[in-house]
Amino acid sequence: MLAVRVSSGTTFPPFDDAVGQTRILTGTLAEAQEAALSAAGFTLVASAPTDAPYLVFSDRVWFTASFLRCVRATGGVGRVRISDETWLREMGPLQTAPERPEVALLAAGAPPSLDGPDLPVDLQLRAAPPVVLHPAFAHAQRPLVTGTRLVHGVEHWSHVLRVNLLALVATAEEAKAEFEASPFWKRALRVIGILLRARSIKPHAIARALNRVGTGCTIHPTAVVEACQLGNNVEVGPYALLRGCIVGDGAKIEDYAHASVSVIGAGARLGRTAMCNFSVLYPGAFVSAGGGWQMCVFGRDAFVAMTATAYDLSFGGPIRVVHRGAVVSAETHFLGVAIGHRAKIGAHVKMGYGMAVPNDAFLVAPSGDVLRKWPDAIEGAATVRDGVAVPVVAPKPAP
């Protein structure tokens, strides 16, 4: 079946890229769409066919191959409609019409349009209950929705996070489904191969055996890398920790750095002792030493200095963000910040949750207490005279 992509003209701050250039795993949204279409047996064409039914979709919607197969199997005509309440509640925020993703099947000769009757599609999702790690943030825990039939619009920077996390889930779910559908002998050989690589039945050893590592990678013997996909020429330093991550070509994970369930782009760098969870680093981004970052997006060639901080958890109401020029609820209590392309964040800068730093911005912390020269006989300041410390004299209050 043929497929036609229609342009939405969508951009969103802080990145302002054409939406098709949004980073999804190791490529772009446009590339992810094309890969899913190919895997599902669709051929992307420039104009609508006149002699056969076809698929039409927006350039701002992400989907899996399993979702496309499900749509085609309906045999109907119309725009996809989803009725799963859990999916709409968890994935709906900041989407224009989450119940009607911008994907449709059209009859032969019909003009490429996303208008039309509803075409019900069952995503067959599973919702695992949230794991409450601590009562203090039980209010922020959300159920994990999993499956292989996934679709999501990309209209806000928070969607970059959500879609990348969904893509990670879909990658694991599709591998699991492929394994379960294979013949018994093939599954047995696969299990034996994993156990031989793991040399153990312990979960951590098996997780290491599931890694996919490109050529030219350097992984220090003390580093822990589990259930990850590493591109070519990736460096992982001493005592670094990577769990459930996709890492692009030439990325560098320095000593004691920690990343979990994150996407680290080509040439990106995670500095010593830095921590990133549930985050996306565009190619060339550099998160410097120290500090913890969760649910954040770092733009292309962005730089974040040591001791910069972003809040990510609201203990009050849902976090509010800017969307289409208005401040609205993101309908979540757990969300970090977005750092624009080439933006620079200096030491000690503190950013509130939901904040978006524009492209090319340069933020520095207040510098009123920065010592710029040695004080000379200023009352209240410590000094040294002839090698002898002069006691500090308390400043007198102003009259």
Spell out what each predicted region is.
Residues A65-S66, Q229, I246, V263, ...:
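Activation segment
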Residues T11, W62, V225, L242, ...:
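Surface-exposed, flexible loop/turn segments at secondary-structure boundaries
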Residues M1-L210, M355, D360, P366, ...:
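Terminal amphipathic alpha-helical/low-complexity segments used for targeting or macromolecular assembly
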Residues Y256, G271-P399:
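Glycine-rich hexapeptide-repeat left-handed beta-helix
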Residues G216-M275:
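Acidic, glycine-rich loop-and-beta core segments that form the ion-binding/anion-interacting portion
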